[in-house]
Amino acid sequence: MAIKVFADGANLEGMLDMHDNGNVQGFTTNPSLMKAGGVTDYRAFAKTVLEHITDVSVSFEVFADDEAGMEAEAREIATWADNVYVKIPALNTKGESTAALVKRLSADGIKVNVTTIFTPEQVDEFVDAVSADTPSILSIFAGRIADTGVDPLPLMAESVKKVAVKP
């Protein structure tokens, strides 16, 4: 299993430094990080990032919380560059799964990064949802799981086996 390191943030200078140094294999950000980083124009920030970072994946998250809004945003974000992955949370704020949305997007060739995965059941659900023909990322929040006092290593080991069916 190859381990890939992704930088999570919204500081353009820091992202470019990490990219130029070859320290990471991809980048990801989210609305909270962008707000904390002082980003006021999401599209402009994303397009600036994508002008400079073209050879590794960059994940941008949807802001909407409802399925229709997420889908519209995801379809737009996916047009920004070939190396873009659209981050979709595993659950919305009502606790509803986004697996059906992920399945549609992935089937349509949109690269997704399913984020905030915490359970083996979610891993199963989203391994089933993504297309084997479209690259995808499943982001299991091992650090947050560990913060609750639960050892995330068994989940990670089992998840590696499960995702192997869709490399």
Listing of model-derived features with the role each one plays in the protein:
Residues A2-L16, D20-V24, T28-K111, I137, ...:
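Active-site beta->alpha loop and helix N-cap motifs at the rims of alpha/beta catalytic domains
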Residues K103, I110-P167:
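Catalytic alpha/beta core domains of metabolic enzymes, predominantly
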